[in-house]
Amino acid sequence: MFIREQKIRKPNGKSYSYYSLIESVREGKKVNKKVLANFGALSKSDVEKLAKRFSQIAGLSVDDESETDSEVVGFKYFGIPVFVRQFMKSLRLDEFLDSASSGMRIKFDLVAAFEVMVAAHLFKSGSRAELSVWDWQQKLFWHPHVTEDLDYQHLLRALPIFAGLQPPLEEHLHGRLVDLFSINVDLVFYDLTSSYVEGHGNWSELLIRGYSRDKRFDCKQIVIGLVVTREGLPVSWRVFEGNRLDSKTLDEMVNDLKTRFQLKRCIWVSDAGLLSKENLGVMRNSGYEYILGAGSGTYKEVKKALKTPEMQFEKIADVNVCERKINLELDDKKKISCRAILIDSDGRREKTAAILERRLNLVRDGFANLKKSVENGYYKTQEDIHIAAEKVLHKSCVKKYFCYEFGDQKFDYREKYELVRSQKEQAGRYALLTESKLEIEDIINGYKTLLKIEDAFRVMKNDLDLRPMWHKCDVNLEGHVLLCVCSYLFFRMLDLSLLKGELPTTPGRALQAIKEIRAVGIEKKHEHHWKLMKISNENLKLLDAIGIKDLKKIFNQWAVSAPPYNYERRLWTTQEEALKNRTK
């Protein structure tokens, strides 16, 4: 085991040294080097002290002077709480939570609980189970106001409180975002996703099996509706039952936003999943304009328009566009006239045709194998052959392109090639329905921006760990979703800060850089001190972009009253439970 120095020369000509603890491991005839720890940039004296300390641990002889040297006892994350606290102050969330909870009989720091769980979603890798978050929070170098140690039960008790504060929290965040980013909620995007749990979930009224965006139809789930601005900042969200249809959520969301936010003019943008006669009536009655995606499988008038061969397209916003007026019927039998922006996209055609071909190939291979099995006598009765054929077509989404015949020890199939060819030709066409007087290019660009909400769902599921959900009551599930959305808000605010500061990096990489800013606990002559690790110029620029100007000053203020380093991994919630588990 040894300490390795790695020198890196930057484009500006300066050289920097980074140190790692390396262990040599022999595997057969080879000796592989394994990195045990990365120390980052250290001074020569710190390297010598580390070497002496490791020598002491290994039982090697060292100079007597080592008794008076400093000893590194551990480190804590300092960049994480500073980052979270900065955005909390920008949004005045600490003031909001203190004010909202002033009349509640809460015996723990609600602001600290919010900060810890948001920080965990943004920075902590691995499971988001409350017990692991409760353990992980000890590694954070917090502001002196976080004096009490949050218990596992405090984090659980905070979730229903956050869920109950959601409506006023949404209104508070909307007001602050208008002030900070000068956002204009004249164009909002609405979409839904689902999130499943692995368990019976019999206690829940929300967890119900339904259409799963994650292809987990075997699991119970919730449906999450999210409204974001053109900048991708969340405005409002709701947790629905797992079997709620997309088209049955729009009425509630539109009326709720109209009542609480007093939006006079607003254009709602949604995909084809929200298009229905009922929802068209909802949008017209709300007084808001709309841009709704529509495929060939919705209104017959739209289907007929998309299949018209003599359409005259023109190139607008990188796609072929043709505008028509069509009459649509609402749920009350009333007829309306709206604009149909018919779009023919080569990129969409290529992608959709590739998806269709992949699904067709799966059925082709399945039927070919089934035919071979019947010929070899594996399936003999008509019933067995019929069941096997339906299994091949089940969930393939291409059943209409095939037909088959079967009998005793007989099976044959045929593909409808003309229908497949026609479908591939129409694959790049879709329509946008609107009554807005916007220019065609603005309508198309507005609909393309709908990708921002899809990006929000991707970030929450992949980066912020919306799953797994370990909660055993519906109100805690709603609190969990609220924390995920707030974490995504911080994520988007960081992205906008990077764009404003013209820093060529992603929010994910920026979060990793912030995580590397640490406070080191040092003991010298039985006295404990905190030191701030050296910060690179790139990290200083990053901190400046998000509004943190003097990190050392903040650290010195926090370190004055910070307790000595102390961390013990906690495996159980209470000492009594630990003893109980030991005796089993």
Language-model region placement:
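Conserved glycine(s) in the ABC-transporter nucleotide-binding domain "signature"
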Residues: M1-A113
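Anion-binding and metal-coordination hotspots
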Residues: F2-E5, P11-G13, S17-S20, G28-K29, ...
